């Protein structure tokens, strides 16, 4: 309809604390943030003074930016932002106090991150500084998990801003049926488990390029209003990092300011300022007078990292080092405090949950950022240890309310065989002990008790008689069986009498360059197990071309007499190869070298034999269990029949696959090794789904439907820094994990099964007197190769686009040219 308008808002995502740059006021740190934000503010004000009523929408991280960096290095920015709120109608919306991984938080961590962003004792809340803010959240990295709808509603949040984008910097474009333009440019209602909230589809500068230019985009939408195809106002919210080069004018010599999408915020406003149907607005201003148009549902966990998911923050070994420390602190807080937010580690833990301590940087973090993350995570653990109750006896603290208790312990004396362990305790029904180090210096203990108590006193020694182990190549539980071949491969796996795997059930390999290098089994032996269990040990070697150090691995499969699951301890020592590539651009200065020939790390790929409609089941960090269908990808976009990597599955203890007849679940011992989403998956064209716990896949980005025949999508994947493989971060590292393979029946998981799986995953706490032979295990189950600093100076930083072209020149000439031609042609037509 002609009387309808198109409302346009410009959003600036302010976070001066980066994973890909350091902490200095120059281009190696936050200097570019300050430069670009100042220019944005001055440009907006100049427009206002010349009668163009443009407004800015700011989602600014509080602790690092508003409280620390900007007051010290650029207080003028805060003053100008305040002035614009009062004088020109700029709007502040919520990002989160610590630019945190909101979706991977517990309820208390989440609520604190939102509440402190609004107001806090240090005076860095949005209300504290600006006097007001809109209760709209643009979550850092658009991280969202469905069950948090209830918390957002509880906190009075009006809406979420999530990307609906044409490039793999997106939240939900590829996981729902395609929205009409009327819906895509209006708030929509999202519903999960009967609770609803408003989501505002949000766009980036890449989407502007996809449309050719902003003027062409709004003109196209206007035609649909005039024809009656669209009968509502529309809202176009362009939101991008405030340090993005797209906001500032690019020097093109005599063509400066003449090519669309190269003139920064100045060009984006100038292009449309003369159109009578344009209203410059803000998200809060629009939803005040416009109700949601469409309805959407999805159960995937969203984030805007590599492969449109959680890869960038969860698949690096360093991610797991920091995340496992968070998990241990969370577990300890259940013993030290009556409520999580009262625990001694809580405040520092909230800060540690900043996404910056995990990614987006690829393949590794900036060397300074790793240092600060390690220091803060050390403090988080120390905060809890100092107040842990002193033990007069070895005590197991039950933090899950279950009969199953699981802990990792340090063994302080040299022992020859774990099978000689003796454990005594009142109401102890059974136990199993397996080594988590090949030298028996640590062990994983599983206890089954007859009665549910808050804590159990136990006695442990290694004076028992060592068990004689006889080799069996078949592990059987009441519901599972696993057969091993003579060379250590898995021959078959059955769950509830159904074969769900053959020789391809377990595969282990590295992709280096363009070749796949499989792990090489060298031995299969009986596993020495303490207590009532038995197992099989697989050992082998890992080799890569021109390796400086070879790799090795140990896979210990074992069963107990009190569970239907088959459990696994994995230790993988990755080979080390020479690191000679430095990623040092104006956008991403990592300060270190990598070997970019590493493409994929697949240490323990599980491919269950399932049929037809396969779903992912997952548990998040609010203890919510949900699932999504893997065929939702091709159903939403037929070009996504095959997806080389997807990670929409937070792993708060377990993740799995199932079809209409049942499936299999991988439960991970969170206090041994964990990350917010440790298990990427791969969808094959024949509907097969593969799981890659503690690994990372690489390949083609999934398809995002667009207006420009994919020219922008293809160019974006070549130059985006986070689009590189994460695999180089595994070079020379070592990781130990413990997880359980649980059968899932056709009827789903019973409450009893859920309780056992969660008890195994969440674990217990153990406290011991100093003179005992065992102690709580406090070391990391991961070692990383020392970073080799590149010594790059600020003057040596490269153009990020040119760096993206490196190694892809042929592709960039064709795809980049098509993208530029599309922009220029569209710009000419839109005049």
Q: PLM ranges: what are they?
A:
Residues 243-254, 287-306, 346-368, 678-717, ...:
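Aromatic/acidic polysaccharide-binding cleft in carbohydrate-active enzymes
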């Amino acid at each position: 309809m002609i009387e309808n308008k198109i409302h346009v808002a410009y959003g600036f995502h302010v976070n001066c604390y980066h994973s890909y740059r350091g902490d200095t006021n120059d281009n190696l740190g936050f200097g570019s943030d300050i430069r670009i934000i100042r220019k944005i503010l001055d440009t907006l004000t100049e427009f206002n003074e010349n009668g163009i009523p443009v407004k800015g929408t700011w989602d600014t991280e509080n602790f690092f930016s508003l409280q620390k960096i900007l007051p010290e290095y650029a207080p003028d920015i805060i003053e100008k932002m305040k002035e614009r709120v009062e004088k020109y109608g700029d709007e502040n919306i919520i990002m989160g106090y610590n630019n945190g991984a909101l979706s991977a938080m517990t309820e208390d961590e989440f609520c604190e991150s939102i509440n402190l962003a609004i107001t806090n004792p240090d005076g860095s809340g949005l209300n504290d500084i600006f006097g007001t803010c809109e209760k709209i959240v643009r979550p850092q990295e658009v991280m969202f998990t469905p069950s948090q709808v209830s918390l957002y509603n509880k906190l009075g949040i009006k809406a979420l801003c999530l990307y609906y984008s044409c490039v793999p910097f997106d939240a939900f474009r590829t996981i729902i049926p395609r929205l009409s333009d009327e819906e895509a440019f209006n708030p929509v209602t999202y519903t999960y488990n009967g609770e609803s909230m408003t989501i505002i589809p949000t766009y980036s500068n890449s989407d502007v390029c996809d449309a050719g230019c902003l003027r062409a985009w709004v003109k196209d939408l206007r035609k649909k209003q005039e024809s009656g195809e669209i009968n509502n106002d529309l809202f176009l919210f362009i939101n991008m990092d405030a340090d993005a080069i797209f906001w500032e004018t690019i020097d093109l010599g005599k063509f400066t300011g003449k090519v669309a999408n190269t003139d920064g915020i100045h060009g984006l406003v100038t292009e449309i300022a003369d159109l009578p149907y344009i209203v410059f607005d803000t998200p809060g201003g629009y939803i005040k007078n416009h109700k949601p148009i469409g309805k959407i549902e999805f159960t995937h966990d969203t984030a805007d990292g590599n492969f449109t998911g959680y890869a960038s923050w969860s698949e690096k070994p360093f991610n797991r080092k920091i995340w496992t420390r968070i998990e241990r602190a969370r577990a300890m807080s259940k013993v030290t405090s009556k409520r999580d937010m009262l625990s001694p580690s809580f405040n520092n833990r909230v800060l540690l949950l900043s996404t910056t301590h995990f990614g987006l940087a690829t393949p590794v973090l900036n060397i300074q950022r790793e240092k600060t993350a390690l220091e803060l995570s050390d403090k988080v653990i120390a905060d809890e240890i100092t107040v842990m109750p002193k033990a007069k006896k070895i005590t197991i603290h039950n933090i899950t309310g279950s009969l199953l208790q699981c802990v990792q312990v340090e063994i302080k004396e040299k022992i020859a065989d774990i099978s000689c362990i003796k454990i005594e305790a009142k109401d102890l029904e059974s136990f199993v002990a397996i080594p988590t180090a090949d030298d028996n210096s640590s062990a994983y203990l599983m206890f089954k008790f007859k009665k549910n108590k808050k804590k159990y006193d136990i006695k442990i020694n290694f004076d028992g008689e060592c068990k004689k182990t006889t080799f069996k190549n078949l592990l059987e539980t009441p519901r599972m069986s696993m057969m091993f071949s003579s060379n250590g491969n898995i021959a078959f796996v059955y769950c509830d009498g159904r074969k769900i795997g053959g020789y391809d059930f377990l595969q282990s390999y590295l992709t280096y360059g363009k070749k796949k290098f499989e792990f090489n089994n060298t031995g299969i032996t009986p596993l020495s197990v303490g207590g009532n269990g038995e197992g099989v040990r697989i050992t082998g070697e890992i080799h890569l071309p021109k390796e400086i150090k070879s790799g090795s691995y140990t896979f210990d499969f074992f069963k107990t007499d009190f569970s239907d699951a088959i459990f696994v301890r994995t230790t993988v020592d990755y080979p080390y190869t020479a690191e000679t590539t430095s990623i040092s651009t104006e956008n991403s200065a990592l300060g270190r070298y990598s070997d970019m020939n590493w493409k994929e790390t697949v240490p323990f790929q599980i491919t269950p034999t399932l049929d037809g409609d396969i779903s992912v089941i997952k548990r998040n960090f609010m203890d919510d269990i949900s699932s999504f269908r893997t065929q939702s990808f091709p159903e939403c976009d037929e070009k996504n029949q095959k997806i080389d990597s997807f990670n929409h599955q937070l792993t708060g203890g377990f993740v799995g696959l199932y079809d209409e007849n049942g499936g299999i679940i991988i439960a991970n011992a969170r206090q041994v090794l964990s990350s917010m989403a440790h298990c990427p998956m791969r969808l094959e064209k024949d509907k097969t789904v593969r799981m890659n716990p503690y690994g990372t896949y690489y390949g083609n980005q999934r398809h995002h439907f667009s207006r420009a025949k994919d020219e922008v999508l293809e160019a974006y994947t070549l130059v985006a820094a986070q689009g590189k493989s994460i695999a180089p971060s595994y070079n020379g590292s070592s990781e130990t994990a413990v997880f359980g393979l649980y059968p899932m029946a056709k009827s789903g998981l019973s409450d009893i099964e859920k309780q056992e799986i969660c008890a195994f995953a969440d674990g217990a706490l153990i406290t011991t007197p100093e003179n005992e032979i065992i102690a709580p295990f406090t070391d990391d189950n991961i070692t990383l190769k020392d970073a080799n600093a590149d010594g790059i100076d600020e003057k040596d930083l490269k153009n990020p686009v040119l760096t993206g072209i490196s190694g892809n020149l042929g592709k960039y000439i064709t795809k980049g040219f098509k993208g530029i031609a599309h922009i220029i042609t569209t710009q000419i037509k839109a005049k």
